[in-house]
Amino acid sequence: MKIGILTYYGDLNCGTNLQAYATLVAVRQRHPQDDVEVIPFHAFRPQRKPYLSNATLQSLLYDWRRIQQYNRFKKEFLGITKDNIIADIKSALHFIKERNYDIIYIGADTLLELDRLPQGCHDISAYWLSPDIKAKKVLLAASCKNTEYDTLSKPQIEKLSAAIKGFSGLGVRDITTYNLLSHFVDREQIEMIPDPTFSLPIDYSHIERYLQKNKIDIPKRSICFHTYRTDSWCSEVAAHFREKGFTIVSLRPAPWADIILNGLSPLEQLGVYRYFSLIVTHRFHDTIFALKNGIAPLTYVSDSSYTTTLGNSKCSSLIEDFNLYPQHIIDNPSELKARYFIERIEAILNSFDSRKEAIEHKIQSCAQAYLGFLDKSLTD
């Protein structure tokens, strides 16, 4: 059989690339005799730009390394040597159809989102596929980001209805996607499943080699930040915890950080979290990788474009699944201020150790649930 994995990949986002890799690994393990590939398709050009704000010559050199490492990862680990960027929806669907897949797994990541479509567009993205594509189609931890039924136009509702009814399995990653699909099919047909990266083992040799080669020593008491350049509260929060004896690490160039780690490959970054006491991040997969490495995340939602009208987001859904809500998330834009971050970080540092055992069990159950859904899809 020929099996395609339709997903996001190829930008400079560690989580995006690792979820694609985790999906590829899991599907190949269950189809050892079949031709399994990540479909070499983008509906838009992936962002692959260096960090220019607060850049130094050294940070630009590390960024250049990061870009090269991501190119290598795409080729060696995802098996993609040529990208096909097809913005036109009909042309994209034709491209996928002509590859003659027997099975297509759609997911993970937010590829079911509709806010990348042009303003006023009443179509749905090619990632939803269409009834014309006759392969067996399975949603595999897919997310619609912030798409809500009430925001859809009548043509979009009709097209989504036809697309969803063509899926053999409906495995979704968050409550927002579950709620959207429940307008089209019975809730019993939809299954909430974890992100594929829960099933991906961590090989620490990648980050160990990187740190040794670059002579980087990360002290035990370290707090990492993965933030936007416009997050003005960072410097005050960093200064507060530096005074308390913490080393400040940043995954992007930042004048207030003691150590900058912007040159990591996806597999290097996957293992770096274990060197921190805590990470402050706006990234969904940072949160997962922190938990997998046994450290505390404080996740924040940067603006309302990432949430529904009810305040749900992929990050809040994840934090709730681990019974870490509300302490481990700041999802109110009015609380994106230094004092709120300082209060939360101090509270988390004082309480997280008592939760580690439960978190470890939850991570194992997440991996089993994801792989269990995949196994079930083989027989459905």
Where are the language model's segments positioned?
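Active-site anion-handling motifs in enzyme catalytic cores
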Residues: M1-D380
